[in-house]
Amino acid sequence: MKKYILILFALSLIVSCSQVTSTTFNGFGPRDFPITMGSQSSVDVVIAMDKLWEEGDFDGMREHISDSARFVWEDGRVHSREEFINSLKSDTLMYSWTFDWAFSVKDDNPQEINEWVNAGFNVVETTKSGDTLGRAHYNEWYLINKDGKISFWFNTKANR
């Protein structure tokens, strides 16, 4: 009996010490390659952009945006980097928001080194006098290039 207990104990020790492998991909893409998780450094670019946006440091955003970046708003407007920054500077409304999530995924093309970051925000839009104009959930996608800069951005809006 003692022998069986020792064998059982040894087996349980071996099983409990074996390394657990985790799946780093899921889903599918148009080229039949798996989708894999991206890096924290790409998420950090979006976090830095959000901080600058919240502080109103729109000129500071240039550091995180490639010269040839394109920004596509939920209403169809398309901006270059400078048009994007200028539109933020000239906006007459006030916004408050919660930054609810961000995660990064790699392109399904193994030759591609850009990463996509998805971020979610709940936004309240008000006038300067404090009158609430609307509430919405924004889902944003940022394409982070090999230099760690935003090269493409688009968002969707769900009024709530």
Residue ranges and their predicted role:
Residues D32, H64, S68-H79:
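A short gly/proline-enriched turn/hairpin at secondary-structure junctions
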